[in-house]
Structures are given as structure tokens and as C-alpha cells.
Amino acid sequence: MDLKSGKLAWTWALSVSIALAVVYASVAAPAFASTASIIAPSDPHDPQVDSGWQAGTCNAEPPELGAATCSVATPKQFFERAAAHPNWGFTQFIVAHKAPGETPVGELKDVRVDLPVGLSVNPGATGRCPLDVFEAGASGCDAYGAKVGESMVTASTPITGSPIAPIPGVTEVNVYNVIPPEGEPARFGLELAGNEVFLKADVAYDGNYHEGFTIAVPHALPIELPLPLGLIKGLILKNRLVFNGRAGDGTFITTPSTCLGEAFTQSGSLYSTYLLAASYEEEAQAGYTFPGSAQPPFESPIPPGTSPKECGTIPYAPGLAVDPNTADVNSPSGAAVTVSVPHITGADSQDSSVTKTAQVSLPQGMGINPAAANGLQTCSNALFGEGTKNPTGCPPASKIGTVEITSPPLPEGNLSGDVFVGEQLSRDPTSGEEYRIFVDAESARYGIKVRLTGHVSANPVTGQLTTTFAETPQVPFTSFALRFNGGAHAVLSSSPTCGPNTATTAMTPWSGNPPASPSSPFTLTSLPGGGDCPKSMAARPFAPGFSLKPDSAKAGAFSPLRLHLTRSDGQQELKGADLLLPPGMVGKLAGIPYCSEAALAAAAASGGRAEAGSSSCPGASLVGSATVSAGTGPQPLQIQGKVFLSGPYHGAPLSLAVVTPATAGPFDLGTAVVRVALFLEPETAQVHAVSDPIPDVFGGTQLSIRAIDVELDRKEFTLNPTSCSPLDTTGMAKGGGADPTNPAAFSSFAVNAPFQTTECERLDFKPKLFTRLFGKRKSTRRTQHPKFRATLVARAGDANIARAAVTLPHSEFLEQSHIRTICTRVQLAAQDCPKASIYGYARAKTPLLDDELAGPVYLVSSSHELPDMLVDLRGQVDVRLRGVISAVAGRIKTVFNPVPDVPVSKFVLTMKGGKKGLLVNSRNLCTAPAFSNLNFKAQNRKQLRVKRLPLRVPGCKKHGRHRGRR
């Protein structure tokens, strides 16, 4: 409150919170005199009727006839009803004085009063008097209904020490609610002996938001007394200020709704009022500043035995309204979220409790939109400045919305501002520290700022968002509205179905009563771009786009291979793929080490930026890259990843690991590792790729993946087929279906990518086959069972074999009596063929692998007259060659069809002799040369026929060593 030149001064205050007391108590003792040097003694632990400082709320003022004045010494007169409107509120201070009489020890200059947290003075409850009307004469304010209380002032002179007043006795004047100047939330004024006196209000938005008042007291003017005294100064000795708590609409003063129990009330200073004061003499000292140098403050607690009453009946019926601001499902949403709390008028009514904690959960499926990260910045705690009076310095690119708060003490629309993204402090989406929002609302007109931090917890599986504003200021509001930015970079995506989609809350009042849980359902009406709105998750459409092709289609050539999988907004999530590549579309694994399981685990545990800067997998295992387009709307976020070759996985002999550092603008969500198991169809060597479920939520962010692009571009890694036939990649794309968190509920969509090589007819086809028997001279005789070996040699760059048929000479029959044990279909499927079914061995060398493949040759069950021959090659990958054995014109013929379209530089097949030998000589082999027939067909349809392929026989003198054609 200001005093113009020559005016007396006084103050009014009620109570202040324990939080303020802690702050004051922590201030280092100044070198100057404190409040105790100007205000009469006051012991908060032993309050007396003549204590230098006291304040409170009363049932009656002035008291009934014969009753004592309401003071800390009259607890029965105190108003104890919580969240209600006291009949009266009073403050009283007495200036320290000395003999003779009551001579003040100094001239009061400044007074500071801090009210309790939660006690609200509502200047909007009454009319407000224009300042020019007040200055023309305070009584003119009566016409505006602006009277809110009375002031009683007693003055004393330093000469006589006798109490005086401008008018004999105690001076009483009306106090009016005056329209405050720019930058003040409220101002109250009174006119004393023709002088204007003001109380200037403020709100401690740099602390606990309690209300306070400041008075600047000018020098006292001389008072003319009868001679011989003449002119003397009248100094303030005592002031009692009484406010009508039910002025206007009855809600001028509202007691705190905080109810923490009587034990806490009596042990703490929750409902205390604090006073700081200083004299002219003190403030004349160099370096003295008010109120800092006046610490510590005087405390006026509520009287012993008093505490808030009727806590259980404090109303609390908050409301919630959520508007997605879009009619489309799975689209950018500039959502508006409004929490409301009724302001209950009426002098005899309890007002609504102030909200302690507001927790709002958006519907599942309405989550963070990664597209918002494009160009996004975050705001640090220091730049936000919560708990300070520093200007908010959040960068413009961190703004994601606006806020508007309506509070009963302020005209509607006067408290508004911006919503910013807070700096990430954690990678745990459930912590509320990974995602934070900073709310900065202010009113320059009324000098109030509200800075709040909302902690956003994101479900790591579903992406559902729950925002919590905890321990909110005990300041009443009727509406708290957040409006998030929409458009291409909207921070939220709308729900995936029509709904009703329901937002829920858990609203906890300061009263200590049970939380309230208002909810807000809303519906959507259409798919993005048109179409019927899906009523359930399973009803959502799913028709992804798909392509897989090499950069070059040249047959037998190495070429980068590209996969493209895409979906539109509104469709089911992309959850994976199960693909069978064309025969012959394979990879060269030679020289490539695996990224180990330990390295992949380290990648999954590392931050995205750390992984992007230094991959956990060795560079030597890198085979390609991946790009993920994430987010709803026209400008999804592009996220880059790497593809590494890895080892066995989920029963597959090897795998790919797609390692994607999940960095989105300023956010680091960690590193996503998605494995793709690479099976090999054993009889065609076709690659069968089966991905893990692709996360649709990562780090709590709902990814809304729009496209996945994988490029396998390592030099000489992916190899084209040598076939000229039309080929295709077939398989299934997996959608989120009825529940994107449950693979059993996924949907499937058949995909197909046709492919045909070029220039395949230019490939040569010139393989060579050598056959021979092993053993001593005896093994060449009739009825003997020689050991047999066939060796195939192929040239690099030729077309691969598609079918191989070899017919042995008439000299070699099948010894059916030696076919004793055959591997059954069941045993073969279980890879548990008995040892006795092994009749030979084979090995193969391919330029695609570092090591050769090798394994046994079985006789297996078949649908033919004779058992089939199965060559079971094992190694880095496993391949099976099935040969159909038959008798043609008295000769043994074996046909391998199909033969995988993969390059083989050398293949050696060795069949046992002796007791396990399947061949028996029909004559003495040394009597004449023996020739086989060869019929090879290439993948590009070229053929190689040899009718007289020599069989090399050991031990014959004349022709047994004939090596034949090559």
C-alpha cells in the first residue's frame, strides 16, 4: 500500500503457508536490524492479545456487546470452516514503543504481509472503483459497490507518548476495491484524513503462489497541537484492519481447502501469516534492502486448538472436455484438453476444493506423433524459469500449443500463454521425465505468471499418454485449457477407430477427500482422405504397398536389393513381413563376420545418438541401410538405421539385424533392434525372410510407421538369379489387426513383387563332370561292389544348373539287397535319420560361403519304385539335393531336379563300396571301357548332353585308367 506525501500507513494480512516459513527461515541473518526492531514483541508459540503481530479470520467483527475483540487470544471467535467465506478477516500490528507512555521506537516505512498458501482474496467478488473516482473522493466508490472493509488507526507522538488520532479516538475509515494499475492483480484503497492510502497486492509465482501485500509508508506529516507543543510528528502506533470476507457476491475471502489433519496443523505453520517491517532509520543505512534485510519475519499462527473444519463436505466436481479437432482417425490432431472446476458462489457455501494433482489420460491409440519432431527443439529447466521471476526463454521451436486459464479473481481471458516441450531427462517413458510439457500462462495486465510442469508418462507397449500436474498451486481456477498445435507437425495423432474414444482422469483435491474421475468421450467419423470410419481395431483397412527388386536385373550379377513397404494413414500398423524371395536371389556371405548377440544386446541398451555415432556392431558386418518414415500427416519423420548380418536366430541359420537409432528431433528414445530370421528352403535354396514384430510403439512414442525402406547395398552381397523365367517375391505383410500388441491378433495381406532377369541368355553353361570307381583290381570283377565318386566342376559367371541327370553304364547295376535301412519321412523331417541309412558322403564348394558344405548321403522314403537319394549338405547354411533313382533300359539313372540356382564351383559325391555299396558290377570292368550318359539343363534353359562320359576304373591294364572326356 502506498502512502502519498503526508499520509499515515497501516497494513492488513491474514496467514501464510509453512512453505514460506521454511524459505524465510533459511535466509542468512542480515547485518541489519530485523522486523523485531520496529514491531512490538510477538511470540508465535505463546500468542497474546497484545502481541505485536496477529492475524486471522473471525465469525464476528466488531464483537457482540461485552465480548472481547477477535484476536489470537479468542480462539472461539476464529472462523475454522475450510474452503468457505469467513465473516471477517483481520490483521493487527503494534509498533514497538517505549516510555514515556507509548512512544514508537521509530518511524515505520515499509510493511510486507504474506498470506497463507490457499487463502484467496477475490477482487472480482465485488465492484471495482475506478482510480479517478477514488482520487476525487473515496466516498464516490460506494456507488460501485466497492467497499470491502474498514481500517482503524491509532497514532502516537514521540513527545508526549500519548495515543492520538487525526480525530479524537481511533480513526475508522472504509476500504475500497480499486481497479489496479497495469501489472497489479489487485489494489485496495482508503482515504484517511483527506489522504489516499493503497494496498498493492501480488502473487508469489516464483514460489508457492501465495498472495501478499506491500505498503510503502512515507514520512509522517507534522500535527499541530495546542501551545506550547506546537507542531509535532504523529507516528503510527497501532493498526487494525478488518475485511468483510463476504463482501459482494459473498466470496471475497475464501479460506484454504487444505486439510492435512489437526496434528499437522498444530505442529506446523501451514495457516500462519507473516509480517516484515522496517523503519526509515533502518532503511537509511547503506546497503539496506527491503524486504530482504528485514528477515526473519514475524509469524502469526492460528490459535492453539483451532484447525480447518468441515473438510469432508468440501465440494469437488471437476469436469473434462477433450476435442481432437479432427474428424479423421489416425491423423494429425491439434487436440484441446480442458479441465474445469466449478466456482461456487454464495456467502454460506463452501467453494470447490483447489486441485492438488490433475492426471489426464488420453484414449489408447491417441499418442505422440513423430512428425512433430521435424524442426522441434526443447526447452531447458533454466530457460523455462519455473520458480523464478526470470523471463521465460524457451526457444520458439519448442512451442507446441497454447494455454488459457480462467480464475475467479481475474476477468476471463486474462491469463494465457504458451505450451513448450521440456528437455528430455530420462529414457524411461513411464518416468514422466522423458516427455514433459511446460505451461507458461501470464497476465501482463494483472502481473501474474503461472508456470507449471506437466509430466507425461507413456505406456511403453501401447503408447497411451498420461499427463500429470502434481502439487499444483493452491490457486482457484474454473478452467484450464491446453490447445496443442495441429497441422503437418501436430504433436498428437488421433485415435485409430471411430470410438467412442474416452479420455479419463484422476483429479485429487487439496481437501484430502477422494479423487474425482471425470471422463470425456469423443467420436471420429472418417478415414483420412475419405471412407467409412472403422468401428473396431480389426475393422481397419490394411492394404500395404510392397516392392522388392534389385537396382539391376542382369542375370547372375551382383546388385543392391531394395525393399519398400508402405501404408496410408488410417490403415493398420505395419507389424512385419514373411517373404519368400525368388529362387537364385541370394547373398554372398563369404568374408562377412556376424554381428554377435552381445553386440546386438549392447545396441538395444544404448542411446540412439551414441549408437548413431559408434555402432555396437562391427563395420565389417554391415550389409545395408534402412529408412523408417514415422508419423501421421503429410510430412512423416525420416529415421535412419543400419542393417547388419547376424547369426542363427529363431531356428534360422542366420539373420539380419536392423539397428535403428531412435532419435526424433531433440529426443533420444534409445535404439530399436529388429531381427529378420533368414531361413533357407533346403531343396531350392530360396531365402525365406521372417521379421520380428516391428514395434508400433517405441520409447512410449506411437510410431505410426508409414514406410519402411531397406537397401542391401554392400558391394557384391546380393546376387541375381541366372534363370530366365518370370519370378516373384511372395509372402505376407503383417498388420496390427485387432491388437497390435498381440502377434496372435495380427492380420495378413498377401504381397507379390514380380521379377525377371535380363541378359540371362548371354550366360554360358559349361560345367564338367568326372566319374570314377575306387578299389583294388579285385573291385573291378563281376559281382563286386566298388566305391563310386562323381566330381562336378563349374565355371564362375556361367548359368547355374537347374536339372542334372546321370545314367550309369550297363556295367553298374543297383544292388537292391544292400538297401537295408531307409530314412523315413518322419525321421527326415525331424533330422533324425538313422546312421544305417547313410550310403555315401558329399561336399560342395560355393563362392558365396567361406567354408564348404558337407554331409551324408541317405536313402530316403519316396513315392517312386526305388528310394530317393538325399544329399544332406550342412554348414553355414543347409541344402538338400534329392535324386530320384530309377532303372531305364537296364541302366541306373539318377535325376536331381530341382537344383538350386546358386553358384557351385565344385561338388563331390562319394558313394560307399563293399557291404554298403549300392553299385554291383555286372561284368568285369577291365574287359571294355564303361561310359555314362550326362544330361544337364541350365537355369537359362541351355543344355549340356554327353552320351559317352567315361567312367574311370582302377587297376585295368589296357583301358581301365582311361580318363575319358572332360
Question: Would you name each region that the model predicts?
Answer:
Residues M1-A33:
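Sec-dependent, cleavable N-terminal signal peptides
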Residues F32-R966:
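Ser/Thr/Pro/Gly-rich, low-complexity intrinsically disordered stalk/linker tracts of secreted
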